[in-house]
Amino acid sequence: MFIKVLGSAAGGGFPQWNCNCANCQGLRDGTIQAAPRTQSSIIVSDNGKEWVLCNASPDISQQIAHTPELNKAGVLRGTHIGGIILTDSQIDHTTGLLSLREGCPHQVWCTPEVHEDLSTGFPVFTMLRHWNGGLVHHPIAPQQPFTVDACPDLQFTAVPIASNAPPYSPYRDRPLPGHNVALFIENRRNGQTLFYAPGLGEPDEALLPWLQKADCLLIDGTVWQDDELQAAGVGRNTGRDMGHLALGDEHGMMALLASLPAKRKILIHINNTNPILNEQSPQRQALTQQGIEVSWDGMAITLQDTAC
């Protein structure tokens, strides 16, 4: 299985365009050791030629321009994106669909709850009908495996997770199970497995078996501490309010990852306020000591022989 991180930051990217927090200002003036990041999105493949896009970031055009694997040579117009899967209806995971309109129709897999949000509150499915058929919806049901024709050896399973619906949704603060899913991806030919969850608010007993059997975890690293935005003076929401489990809390994401057997544990969807973006910070060193990696834009991951 081949995975490439197109974008590794949370909403707004890093540095965020209007932010002068310690991280954003430090990156701009060169006083911290850090790398710019675009908003969260990945591609996966069973052969390294045809790809499935998992979430469509607002930065998708820039990301595709820096990903030669997606450029389809020998045709006047084309792409190696063979399908799109959405894990939620958040702005930073769906706005990129608008930038892909010239390539419509696109085959899009998402839950009915996500499709409802994207047909009403943020109606990209409705808007894009005017571009060559727009987005063709393939409903996915929790824990019901499905495949995408472009990558037939990969089996995808949507696993409901505790998080939140987007601020524009009428289901904000009262999400249904289909509003947020992780993806458990298995290569049916050799058993390689990836668990992808860019937004995870609270792991529960039903989720643990999926986490425990994954060879590789690509998982929510949004904030270090739950009140991080408040402490930085840039917002009032906590990590939990936004549907994200803080890394550094006593029973947070880092503690959870330490208990899991995956050979690689990689963080994605990292907020611009998170101190782990500073590669010399104590928080980053704590992750390194636990064997936890921090993804970056363009990071390539290859899973071979049931191991990462």
UniProtKB/Swiss-Prot annotation:
Keywords: PQQ biosynthesis, Transport
Pathway in which the depicted protein is active: Cofactor biosynthesis; pyrroloquinoline quinone biosynthesis
Gene Ontology biological process terms in this record: pyrroloquinoline quinone biosynthetic process
A Pfam entry, by short name: Lactamase_B_2
CDD domains referenced in this protein's UniProt entry, alphabetically: PQQB-like_MBL-fold (cd16274)
Alphabetized SUPFAM superfamilies for the sequence: Metallo-hydrolase/oxidoreductase
InterPro entries named among the record's database cross-references: Metallo-B-lactamas, PQQ_synth_PqqB, RibonucZ/Hydroxyglut_hydro
UniProt-listed NCBIfam families: PQQ_syn_pqqB
Function: May be involved in the transport of PQQ or its precursor to the periplasm.
UniProt record similarity statement: Belongs to the PqqB family.
HAMAP family in the cross-refs: PQQ_syn_PqqB
Protein name: Coenzyme PQQ synthesis protein B
Organism, scientific name: Klebsiella pneumoniae subsp. pneumoniae (strain ATCC 700721 / MGH 78578)
Gene giving rise to this polypeptide: pqqB
